[in-house]
Amino acid sequence: MAETYTRKEFVTKYGNDIRKAVRGSGILAGTLVAQAIIESQGKATDGSYRVGQSSLSRKANNYFGIKCHSAWKGDTFNIDTGEQNPDGSTWVHQNACFRKYDSVADSIKDYVKFLKDNKRYERAGVFKAKSVKEQAEALKRGGYATANNYADTINKVYLGVKDEVLKYASPKKKAGKIILFSFAGLTLIGIGLGIYYAVRKK
């Protein structure tokens, strides 16, 4: 049986996979986490909502609702899915084809690859976004989801797990290198950030 998680448990368990996947991609860890929660969450038998509880995530390890598309050569899973028109009306896409993965980690990696491979997301400004809210709005413009409130929902979900995302999933900034050299009887210590300290030799 597939595992399910609270929102914070999900970030803790897959934080390292998320960090590796987003590093250098222009995709914010908070955006990825919030999308995974929204797309995979479902109601458990005890009435609580769990990440990984949706049929698509349980049966196909698809945590991001990514459809097959013509470029996909892997396994697939078909299921009905609800869509929303710009005017707010809804309709059901019957027997829609979704990507199927061997693991949640594979789903996380393919999410990043999917966004990078599709030029419409670059044109929409996804990879230039400086905040989760801004990136979510760009994803909506790029056609990732049809729900009119998608960007607001992503940002709200992110804020609920922000501390965990920053602790477990966000790429760590590299520390500056220590540089030592002597000049006029002083030892200059550079920390690789354009800042230097002068220390007189004893």
Where are these regions (language model features)?
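Short, Lys/Arg-enriched, disordered terminal segments
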Residues: 1-4, 200-202
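Single-pass alpha-helical membrane anchors
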Residues: 172-202
